[in-house]
Amino acid sequence: MSHSANFVNVQSPPSYIQLAQQQQQQQQQQLQQQQQTQNPTSPTSFLAQQQYSGNIPTTASNQQPYQHIPQPYQPNISSILQPLPIRYIYVNQLPLAQQQQQLQQNQLQQQPPNVIYQQQPLIVQQQQQPNTVQQQQQQPPQTIQQQPNMAQPQPQQTQQFTMEQTFQNILNKIKDKFDKFTTNHVGQDNITFNNAQLPIAKECNTILLKLQNNRNIHTSSLPFTLTPEVYKPPEFFTKVDIIQYHLSGLASILVLMKLSQVDPSFAKQINLMTVKSKFMIEMLAKIFQQQLDNRNNNNNNNTMSMSITNSTVLSSQKNNNPIIIYFNQQFENIKQLKDYFETSDISSNGLVFFTQTLFSMLTGRGYFWYIGEEVTKQLKYKIFETIYDNLFRTVMKCTSETKYKYNLGCFCYSYFKIIQSDHQVTSARFVTQKPQIKDDLYKYLLHYLSLSNDQLSRALSDVPISDSTIWLIYAKTCCLLNQEEKAQIWIQYFINEATDRVTAAAMIQLDEDIAHYHSKSWYVDIMKSIEEEKKKRIEEDDRLNKQRKQQQQQQQSNSSSPHIVGGHVQDQYSEIKTNLLLEGLVLKNMNHDASLISSNVLLNLHPLPQSKEVQIAQQRLNERLELYMLKNSKEIPGDGNCQMHALSDQLYGDLSHSQEVRKTIVDWLRKNKDFQLPNGATICQFVNTNNWDDYCNDMSKNGNWGDHLTLLAAAEHFGSKISIISSVESQSNFFIEIIPSKILNDKVLLLSHYAEFHYGSLCPLR
């Protein structure tokens, strides 16, 4: 549903435009009077002598000043950063035709325009020097460094003109860059695009992960967060890369068009650009559909696993392809930007997309459309302030939309870090040396930090999100605001829920926002537990190297595990796939990306092996392990005890406890025959024999395969989550998770399952 761009719940009185014109005439008269009393050889303008405060002027008439919706306290940036007067350039703008008419009138009067867009809030640019005590109280104190020098004033008219030219120059550069990109990667009649390759299955699955987690396809960053590293464009552009760059460039051009006094005829060129984008999206959708049809018709060759055909982006319906859905959403947002340029009407989502594009252009180092080096620091500050205004208004307007709270919380923290860096206010200084920071600067930093903390707290309470980046940002805001109890909870949560606790703890240890808590007893205890894990990891690496040497010398057989007792494994496998739905057994695991399936289905992963599929299955498993940055911890022998070997390695760091693990599991099974699942079934109902004791006796024998029940028993006895990445062909059920009724151990047991007959032990890549 489309909304107007006016996010202020008041009617804008039309007399304000007239008031602005009256003020302009009054200023011209005063300027003439001042020039008569000054030396004619060194005239100074009236605007140059005014002290810009950013507040709404008090008029001498009966007109009511422009009122904003209620906002929390916000220190005025003008006393700190000497902003350029472009605040509120996205709200209540006149239609483009009226803007151009006003610009022509100003040019006829041989005067530079007093405002970029003729809109009500910009009347602050024509305000006179406040004379009343009340007006002086509205002006926040200024820092010593930024006190205006009345003897050498900076003429604001020149600033406005320079700012307009700056945006125009940036637009021209981005347009030239966009044209070159289109020529090199799209080509005439889309020839180059048609010849570009499709992303392979691994790349498509990576894209899908990013889309599911609301990440940028190329930078992998959340909206309104700062990227820690400089982004590097791909060496070879796939069709997906080309479309994303084309859409991002088009959005950047439309944003700059809105910020500059561009000729309306320039908008005609946008139509051709948008048509080209839509054509490429439709072409990609057709190619995906062809790949899907080929797969359904079983026409794929042995290289299928390296093709898009094997990716989860393909579904049974063309319109359900997640990449195409994403690109179509991007295209609709671009259409809104085009309408915004022409009519100033835009929806809440469109406005957020506008500000998100602008934020990326200013902060995305290495981003293809990066303009951060083209704008002055003061202008950048004002743009950031305007982004804040838009996001805040969106939150106030759409109170039920939690995603806007996350956006505002992330932006406020990012802006806090930018101001910190520019003013050399370290986090340690912010927390412990408050008296040494100028009062207005400290209030300004505190405002954005507090607002970030508040918005993220509200959002996490309303709709929790399984994104560790959000958790860490919120934890850091709690640290900087000395909310120690909350900081402790979220730091511990961030570390414990990480796949690799050691790496997560290293991130915490190196973060300056948390450094002042390093001496706290709870923090010391956390890091001690991590040090123990580090030592175990070193020992595991040493044992792994020794074992590899021994295995190379012994040249052990790589034959598969023997058949499980009974002659009906395949029938059992099919039956369990159909019937074993353990509702509620598996809770949503916040330990992995959203794409990792928090499955409520435990499958018996032991059908009869089919040798012709082994090679494809191995390649499929390797791609999945690489995608989630995992590797085999040790080479597990294929002697029928592979599941027990893998569990032994995960629990004790070596394979020497395999028999002990088997005995422990079987003992638990004997004692818990009637263990009830959440759906009311008992585990003894899921064996291939009516005699539970016979099943346990067979499972206790060396060389017999472990199954789904032994995994369940291991999870319950050891109190640990078990995560399994399988080589099964299904792209929706390859990640299986078993969560015990009571978690006693924070360590997650990571297993692989290869070619339907062999288990492996996994560890993170290092």
Curated annotation (Swiss-Prot):
GO terms for biological process: proteolysis. Pfam families: OTU (PF02338). Residues 129-159, 537-566 are annotated as: Disordered. Keywords: Hydrolase, Protease, Thiol protease. Its EC number is 3.1.2.-. It comes from the Eukaryota. One of its GO terms (molecular function) is cysteine-type deubiquitinase activity. Disulfide bonds: none annotated. Residues 631-765 form the OTU domain. Residues 550-561 have a biased composition (Low complexity). The active site is at D639, C642, H758. PANTHER family: OTU DOMAIN CONTAINING PROTEIN, OTU DOMAIN-CONTAINING PROTEIN DDB_G0284757. This is OTU domain-containing protein DDB_G0284757. It comes from Dictyostelium discoideum (Social amoeba).
